[in-house]
């Protein structure tokens, strides 16, 4: 297992590791290079989602913890610092999305990436805010701008009172070499188990937007933290209201 994801500070409490990391990747923008012809690796910017040339062609993942955080990052808020993730910062990000929604920039908020991939394929949208598998499954370019993508890791924790045999069986399966190879190959996500990486070539990893070592990947991204419970509840409520049209 890669120590860089095994030993993430957010998974360690009082010196004890409570987090079994599974997959890791990015929240970023994706664009269709044959339709967004002016964008390339040298000028990639999250400002693309506000570009009038893609008005009505932007798809946003309906997830405050992803889309709103990426917007705050775009607006210059340091999403790695908990003290910057305030209600005022949430309001700033929500206001920008509401502005984009009201001026017709956003085509739709999508509840899952499969729908976004389909929308990119049928030319309903040209730009999508989402996760790695969009690039792999839609033929879209995964944006990696100079100011960094938003990087994340997902994993499992055991709740108090759980059946430990069943919990460990699930964790062992989720962190296995077979799962690593599958997530890399079929979803384009990085994995905590090194074994899966040997099943893909360097070019295949690059095609999926995944570095061969998470240390490199995580250092090139913005690994966000969650705000306080109070701000998180506020964020989710404001996001739901905005997506619903309020």
Regions found by a protein language model. Give the residues of each.
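A ligand-binding cleft/hinge motif common to bilobed small-molecule-binding domains
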Residues: 121-122, 126-141
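Extracytoplasmic ligand-binding site segments that recognize negatively charged/polar headgroups
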Residues: 1-115, 119
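Short secondary-structure boundary segments
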Residues: 61-62, 132-133, 187
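Periplasmic-binding protein-like
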Residues: 90-100, 136-162, 205-206
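Mature extracytoplasmic/periplasmic domains
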Residues: 154, 159-223
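Conserved C-terminal helix/tail region of periplasmic/extracytoplasmic solute-binding proteins
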Residues: 215-246
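Hydrophobic residues within well-ordered alpha-helices
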Residues: 118-121, 158
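Sec-exported extracytoplasmic/periplasmic mature domains
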Residues: 34, 51-55, 72-77, 98, ...
């Amino acid at each position: 297992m890669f120590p860089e994801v095994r030993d993430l500070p957010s998974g360690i409490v009082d010196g004890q590791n409570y987090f079994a990391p599974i997959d890791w990747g990015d929240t970023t923008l994706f664009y269709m290079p044959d339709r967004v012809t002016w964008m390339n690796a040298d000028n990639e910017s999250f400002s693309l989602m506000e570009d009038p040339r893609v008005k009505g062609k932007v798809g946003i993942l309906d997830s405050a913890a992803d889309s709103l955080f990426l917007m705050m990052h775009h607006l210059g808020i340091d999403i790695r610092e908990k003290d910057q993730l305030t209600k005022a910062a949430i309001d700033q990000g929500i206001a920008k999305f509401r502005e984009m929604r009201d001026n017709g920039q956003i085509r739709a908020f999508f509840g899952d990436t499969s729908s976004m991939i389909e929308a990119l394929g049928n030319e309903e949208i040209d730009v999508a805010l989402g996760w790695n598998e969009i690039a792999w499954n839609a033929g879209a370019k995964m944006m990696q701008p100079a100011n960094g993508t938003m990087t994340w890791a997902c994993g499992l924790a055991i709740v108090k009172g759980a059946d430990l045999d069943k919990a460990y069986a699930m964790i062992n399966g989720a962190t296995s070499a077979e799962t690593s190879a599958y997530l890399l190959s079929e979803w384009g996500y990085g994995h905590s188990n090194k074994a899966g990486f040997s099943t893909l070539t360097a070019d295949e990893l690059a095609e999926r937007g995944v570095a061969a070592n998470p240390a490199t990947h995580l250092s090139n991204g913005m690994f966000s933290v969650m705000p306080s419970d109070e701000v998180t509840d506020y964020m989710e409520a404001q996001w739901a209201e905005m997506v619903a049209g309020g």
